[in-house]
Amino acid sequence: MKRFMTLLLAMLMVLSLAACGDKSSATVDAEGLGKALAERVQFDSTMSIIDAGDYLELPEGSSAAAFMSDGSTMEEIFVVSCKDKTDASAVKIAMQSLLDSQKQEAERYQPEEAERLGSAVFGTYGTCVVLCVTSDTDTANAVIKEYVG
């Protein structure tokens, strides 16, 4: 009986530790999050679906959603869900490079857009990388939190 109780307690401990595992590595629905951002966040221009692969080199096995402004603003959404953190890190570097080049261009011709690019919501959530260029950053962060926990 004493052995059984020891085994039972050990199993309960393992299960409770597993419940505290890294939830940030859970797969994020890139299309769902991208669509939710496009629909719920306030943008100054109409957002249209684009092919993320036209702007970023996407790793094999990743899924992506991307939207860009139809107007003269630099508002955009990129959501890329990768198969592992190594791929997510590479995507984040590529997104940062894209963002930096856009900022540099905007500083010359659209200073107000450079400011918006500078305050973009940009981060890695486990294996998902999100970039949302908008003035409505509070809503964007809330929507992202719903999807990534």
Regions inferred by a protein language model and the residue ranges of each:
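A short, solvent-exposed beta-edge/loop patch
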Residues: 112-149
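Second-shell loop/turn segments in exported
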Residues: 76-84, 128-133
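Short Gly/Thr-rich strand-loop-strand
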Residues: 85-125
